[in-house]
Amino acid sequence: MSNQLNTMDIKEILKFLPHRYPFLLIDRVLDFTPGETLHAIKNVTINEPFFQGHFPVAPVMPGVLILEAMAQATGLLAFKTMSDEPSNDALYYFAGIDNARFKRVVEPGDQLHFEVKMIKERRGIGVFTGEAKVDGELVCSAEIMCARREIAK
């Protein structure tokens, strides 16, 4: 494998993920190796719409959105593994999750780091492990599955 650093800025992320505000939860990819790993970040600010109701007095990022961001990172790794070009003909859908565990809260001002690893891919189903961390401290871990599906037109 090459030692070349592979990154993605928000413009490239938007080419691969169908998500848009307020549901796009990946800001940048710091490094990836197709078929192996991807390291992405989400900058969590007080301006996130979910903080209005979760919780106004003590804002905490909902765990389900941490998992969704992790799933978006797996989708990026899947796209980069299967094809280097974005496709308008197929998407990777969040297909399953196992062994999700939460270890600490995520608050405004935190920077979430996602490390996802591809375990296997078979017949369009990818299996990944993922961890989310803040300041090197584990926030969440999970096993995630995503499925490649053609878009009906």
From Swiss-Prot:
<comment type="function">
    <text>Involved in unsaturated fatty acids biosynthesis. Catalyzes the dehydration of short chain beta-hydroxyacyl-ACPs and long chain saturated and unsaturated beta-hydroxyacyl-ACPs.</text>
</comment>
<dbReference type="GO" id="GO:0009245">
    <property type="term" value="P:lipid A biosynthetic process"/>
</dbReference>
<keyword id="KW-0456">Lyase</keyword>
<dbReference type="Pfam" id="PF07977">
    <property type="entry name" value="FabA"/>
</dbReference>
<dbReference type="GO" id="GO:0019171">
    <property type="term" value="F:(3R)-hydroxyacyl-[acyl-carrier-protein] dehydratase activity"/>
</dbReference>
<dbReference type="InterPro" id="IPR010084">
    <property type="entry name" value="FabZ"/>
</dbReference>
<keyword id="KW-0444">Lipid biosynthesis</keyword>
<protein>
    <recommendedName>
        <fullName>3-hydroxyacyl-[acyl-carrier-protein] dehydratase FabZ</fullName>
        <ecNumber>4.2.1.59</ecNumber>
    </recommendedName>
</protein>
<dbReference type="GO" id="GO:0005737">
    <property type="term" value="C:cytoplasm"/>
</dbReference>
<dbReference type="GO" id="GO:0006633">
    <property type="term" value="P:fatty acid biosynthetic process"/>
</dbReference>
<keyword id="KW-0443">Lipid metabolism</keyword>
<dbReference type="InterPro" id="IPR013114">
    <property type="entry name" value="FabA_FabZ"/>
</dbReference>
<dbReference type="GO" id="GO:0016020">
    <property type="term" value="C:membrane"/>
</dbReference>
<keyword id="KW-0963">Cytoplasm</keyword>
<comment type="similarity">
    <text>Belongs to the thioester dehydratase family. FabZ subfamily.</text>
</comment>
<dbReference type="InterPro" id="IPR029069">
    <property type="entry name" value="HotDog_dom_sf"/>
</dbReference>
<feature type="active site">
    <location>
        <position position="54"/>
    </location>
</feature>
<keyword id="KW-0441">Lipid A biosynthesis</keyword>
